Amino acid sequence: MSAPHGDAAVAPRAFIKLPDPPSSPWAFTDASSRSFLRKWDLEKHARVARFRYTKPFHRMDADEFVRDFFDSDVVNEHFHVLDRTARWRSVREIVRDASSRDEPDERATNADADADPDADPNLTKNKIVEKASYAKTPCAVTSMSLFDRLRDDTPHPRITRVGDCDCLVRKIEDQIDGFAVADNLRSCLIDACDENHETLFSETEKGEFLFKIFSHVALGGSMCQYEERLSPYEDVAKAVYKSLVRAKKDENGIAAVVTDVYSATEVFFGTGTTGHDATTGKKKAVSLFPRPNHRQNFCYLCVDPWRRHVTVWYHAHVPHW
């Protein structure tokens, strides 16, 4: 589905940086939400940026959109990720470092093109990012009722206490995948051996964007200061979700999400022989995270095809020790 605009022939796609909206309901500038994100160590290694794009987005052409996003000069100027040494850099800089062993002359050519004061600020003469690896993230939930069961008597042992359905039930602390698991909520979210809670949420529910946001805030970063109550996690997850996702009511008054969400993990570079592995002939990949394959690594592109806005929310897990 594409947005209902008449300039579908506009090409190529360009991105324009948008300012942050007013604090309310923007979770990433709201004082209360930010204080919790900082407490949970989800701000230091995170970035959020908003852009408007010129060419209509079509769900059947997400490959091109995601690639264009990471290859845009404007995006690379305003949105950075962490490299292998945990330094903030543009995707293009990281790709150029990775490709420096292949063709230094082409790298210099690209650098000259970027330095050209007459060049289009949205485009490059030679694409650096040829492809991006991503997955579509289901996003259909329009209420927080999904988490009501965390307060029910159904799960045993309970997630929250009897008589105080907001207070999390504590347990003997255990280390699982680098996380300190000291309550039944965190055990439910990450312990694969927790048979008591494995059916509390279906795999479909766990795949929903709202559930992923809730899990991210509940697990936090490497220096997370955990909560003893459930409501802060719910409140911040709701605020973040509303900041990234938009819903519209149909003719029957039923709300439906119009935002498409994509989770990116790495980008590929190289045309012809440049940037290809000499053995396999495949394009080389560069991770968007310093330590790949951690569940708290995420780079979500939230696309609103009606407004032609894309918001990127990025976080990289960086161990403290």
Q: What is each PLM-predicted segment?
A:
Residues 238-295:
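Functional cores of ribonucleases/endoribonucleases
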Residues 279-321:
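Compact beta-sheet-dominated globular domain cores
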Residues 226, 273, 313-315:
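Generic alpha-helix signal with a bias toward terminal, lower-confidence helices
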Residues 2-258:
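Extended, low-hydrophobicity segments enriched in charged/polar residues
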